[in-house]
């Protein structure tokens, strides 16, 4: 059967329907795929015949305006020794390229694309004051291209810029570091810079633990260099950064202040303890070790001396002077009359004037210990119950004490006394003298020789005070019956010339601490009668008392036994020795007090200097507004 003939069935409608259905159910191309194809077509269109080496200007005389900005991400380090600042920044650059324009309607409404920055023209902006590394940007990120020809490029960079570090007020210093950006090839007639912002963007800044950015302002400058006749523009950002001083205050300043305080305490330490020089040397050694540790902390620059370096030098001189002064004070402290003689001006200045100015009061102690001992002995000897009395007999005063400035008891034998002048005997007593008979008194059973009448205060010129010793003897009952008079005491007196007494250590006469015990038989030989018979109980008349107080007795008329002479010599030696020791002790105490006054002077001087040095450390940075 022929197709299309009469009576033939109509052709099937399946293929056209299938075609229609297939055309209706076919997926249309996605917008992303369409945009990708549009960007691909756009890139092919833009870069066909594009030359990245030529400036993007339609006229050769036109200027490419590059908008420049800076955003800092982190202040990495400030190297005071090498004088450079390391920063992590984003360099913002924006310019127009007329060869990279298109109509978004022709390319599926594509308004911007990201393209590799190596494919387009870029301004050769570098960091002028680069200290280490590359001057230009090394990491070339993609640029953002807009349909109107605007190009935005923000590559990150780590710069090490040169920075003039001024460590005068270290660690309270504030630095001013700059970063200078500009075109290295094109002058102002080809490329001009326009600042995006007047300050550095710090929104994404990572805070540093040592520095804080106070200010970061950018300024536009033009400069004509010696190499070229053209004028070159640049944008300079000035970073004002301030150091955080907490670390250096704890680890540097506080130890220095404590060492200075230890140096001051050296002058408060007593010299007798023997640790003054040890403390000084210990402080000096600790300061030396401390200086070895902080050499890595202090900026090692020779342009200026840091303030903390000056303070450390001041502390070192401080400690050294304290050692020198301590040695001098110890020398003064250990002086004695056998090695040094104290000048009058030293005694006047350091024992009288300076202590009053320093409000120092010396304790009023009795220096003559031997004199106090003898005075106490005299008080005991003068007590009413000291001398024994027989029964039924009233007590008779027989103890004699010298009223002179030196209350001492001593003896001088015939071999010790000079021939001339003749000394006068004096035996004053604190009590009423015992009754003594006179020659004119017929009722006196016991006549008193003229040689036994001691005057109370008579003394020949050029003589020392009389020294007397009384010995007590109680008569027996047979003696009282035979003689009729009870003799109780004998008094032996002797004097020494003034020139002989003055030759003993040149000081006041000191007292002997003890008397030798002797009986009446040892005082005088048995075959020689005593010139002084006894003291009688009869009350004397006023004339007899006056005569007894005015009679002079030569010392050579008083004979001494050998045992008593040896005892007297021993007592005299002990008295002279104690007197010399007491004099030496007094002078030594004066030297020690002079040393203490010198210590107190330098204590206040060093305290004032330490306070002034500490104020000098903190005051200049505070006045400069850095604290």
Swiss-Prot record:
Subunit structure: Neuronal AChR is composed of two different types of subunits: alpha and beta. CHRNA4 forms heteropentameric neuronal acetylcholine receptors with CHRNB2 and CHRNB4, as well as CHRNA5 and CHRNB3 as accesory subunits. Found in two major stoichiometric forms, LS (low agonist sensitivity): (CHRNA4)3:(CHRNB2)2 and HS (high agonist sensitivity): (CHRNA4)2:(CHRNB2)3, the two stoichiometric forms differ in their unitary conductance, calcium permeability, ACh sensitivity and potentiation by divalent cation. Cells produce predominantly an (CHRNA4)3:(CHRNB2)2 nAChR.
Residue ranges that the UniProt entry lists as topological domain Extracellular: 32-244
Lipid-bearing positions (S-palmitoyl cysteine): 273
Record field: catalytic activity: Ca(2+)(in) = Ca(2+)(out); K(+)(in) = K(+)(out); Na(+)(in) = Na(+)(out)
Single Gene Ontology MF annotation: acetylcholine-gated monoatomic cation-selective channel activity
Topological type in the membrane: Multi-pass membrane protein
Low complexity composition-biased segments: 384-399
Sugar-modified residues: 59, 109, 176
Protein's name according to its UniProt entry: Neuronal acetylcholine receptor subunit alpha-4
Pfam families: Neur_chan_LBD (PF02931), Neur_chan_memb (PF02932)
A single GO cellular-component term on record: acetylcholine-gated channel complex
GO biological process entries: acetylcholine receptor signaling pathway; behavioral response to nicotine; cognition; DNA repair; nervous system process; response to hypoxia; response to oxidative stress; signal transduction
Role, per record: Component of neuronal acetylcholine receptors (nAChRs) that function as pentameric, ligand-gated cation channels with high calcium permeability among other activities. nAChRs are excitatory neurotrasnmitter receptors formed by a collection of nAChR subunits known to mediate synaptic transmission in the nervous system and the neuromuscular junction. Each nAchR subunit confers differential attributes to channel properties, including activation, deactivation and desensitization kinetics, pH sensitivity, cation permeability, and binding to allosteric modulators.
Residue intervals passing through the bilayer: 245-269, 277-295, 311-332, 601-619
Biased composition (Pro residues): 444-458
Post-translational modification Phosphoserine, affected residues: 427, 541
InterPro entries in the cross-refs: Neur_chan_lig-bd, Neur_chan_lig-bd_sf, Neur_channel, Neuro-gated_channel_TM_sf, Neuro_actylchol_rec, Neurotrans-gated_channel_TM, Neurotransmitter_ion_chnl_CS, Nicotinic_acetylcholine_rcpt
Region named Disordered: 384-463
PANTHER family xref list: NEUROTRANSMITTER GATED ION CHANNEL
Record-stated family: Belongs to the ligand-gated ion channel (TC 1.A.9) family. Acetylcholine receptor (TC 1.A.9.1) subfamily. Alpha-4/CHRNA4 sub-subfamily.
Compartments where found: Synaptic cell membrane; Cell membrane
């Amino acid at each position: 059967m022929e197709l299309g003939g009469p009576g033939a069935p109509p052709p099937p409608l399946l293929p056209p329907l299938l075609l229609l259905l297939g055309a209706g159910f076919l997926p249309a191309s996605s917008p992303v795929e369409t945009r990708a194809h549009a960007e691909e077509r756009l890139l092919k269109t833009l870069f066909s015949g594009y030359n990245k080496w030529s400036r993007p200007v339609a006229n050769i005389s036109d200027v490419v305006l590059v908008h420049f900005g800076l955003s800092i991400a982190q202040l990495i380090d400030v190297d005071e020794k090498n004088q450079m600042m390391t920063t992590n920044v984003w360099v913002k650059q924006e310019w127009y390229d007329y060869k990279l324009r298109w109509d978004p309607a022709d390319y599926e409404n594509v308004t911007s694309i990201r393209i590799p920055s190596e494919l387009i023209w870029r301004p050769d902006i570098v960091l002028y004051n680069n200290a280490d590394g590359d001057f230009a940007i090394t990491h070339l990120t993609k640029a953002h291209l807009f349909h109107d020809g605007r190009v935005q490029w923000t590559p990150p960079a780590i710069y090490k810029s040169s920075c003039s570090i001024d460590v005068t007020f270290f660690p309270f210093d504030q630095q001013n570091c700059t970063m200078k950006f500009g075109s290295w090839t094109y002058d102002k007639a080809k490329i001009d810079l326009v600042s995006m912002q007047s300050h550095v963007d710090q929104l994404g800044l990572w805070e540093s633990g040592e520095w804080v950015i106070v200010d970061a302002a950018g300024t536009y400058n033009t400069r004509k260099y010696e190499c070229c006749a053209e004028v070159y523009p640049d944008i300079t950002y000035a970073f004002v950064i301030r150091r955080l001083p907490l670390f250096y205050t704890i680890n540097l300043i506080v130890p220095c202040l404590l060492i200075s305080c230890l140096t001051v305490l050296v002058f408060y330490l007593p010299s007798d303890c023997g640790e003054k020089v040890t403390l000084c040397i210990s402080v000096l050694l600790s300061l030396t070790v401390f200086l070895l540790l902080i050499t890595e902390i202090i900026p090692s620059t020779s342009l200026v001396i840091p303030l903390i370096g000056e303070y450390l030098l001041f502390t070192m001189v401080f400690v050294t002077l304290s050692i020198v002064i301590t040695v001098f004070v110890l020398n003064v402290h250990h002086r004695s009359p056998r090695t040094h003689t104290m000048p009058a001006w030293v005694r006047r200045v350091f024992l009288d004037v300076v202590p009053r100015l320093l409000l120092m009061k010396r304790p009023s102690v009795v220096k003559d210990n031997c004199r106090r001992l003898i005075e106490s002995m005299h008080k005991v000897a003068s007590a009413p119950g000291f001398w024994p009395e027989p029964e039924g007999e009233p007590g008779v005063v027989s103890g004699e004490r010298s009223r002179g400035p030196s209350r001492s008891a001593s003896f001088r034998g015939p071999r010790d006394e000079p021939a001339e002048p003749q000394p006068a005997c004096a035996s004053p007593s604190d009590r009423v003298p015992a009754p003594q008979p006179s020659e004119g008194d017929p009722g006196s059973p016991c006549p008193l020789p003229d040689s036994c009448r001691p005057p109370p205060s008579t003394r020949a010129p050029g003589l020392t005070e009389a020294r007397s010793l009384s010995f007590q003897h109680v008569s027996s009952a047979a003696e009282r019956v035979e003689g009729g008079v009870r003799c109780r005491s004998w008094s032996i007196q002797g004097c020494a010339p003034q020139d002989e007494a003055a030759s003993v250590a040149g000081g006041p006469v000191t007292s002997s601490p003890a008397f030798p015990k002797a009986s009446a038989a040892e005082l005088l030989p048995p075959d020689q009668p005593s010139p002084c018979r006894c003291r009688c109980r009869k009350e004397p008349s006023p004339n007899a008392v006056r005569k007894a107080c005015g009679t002079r007795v030569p010392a050579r008329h008083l004979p001494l036994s050998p045992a008593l002479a040896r005892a007297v010599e021993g007592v005299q030696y002990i008295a002279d020795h104690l007197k010399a020791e007491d004099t030496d002790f007094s002078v030594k105490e004066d030297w020690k007090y002079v040393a203490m006054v010198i210590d107190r002077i330098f204590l206040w001087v060093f305290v004032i200097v330490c306070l002034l040095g500490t104020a000098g450390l903190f005051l200049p940075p505070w006045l400069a507004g850095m604290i």
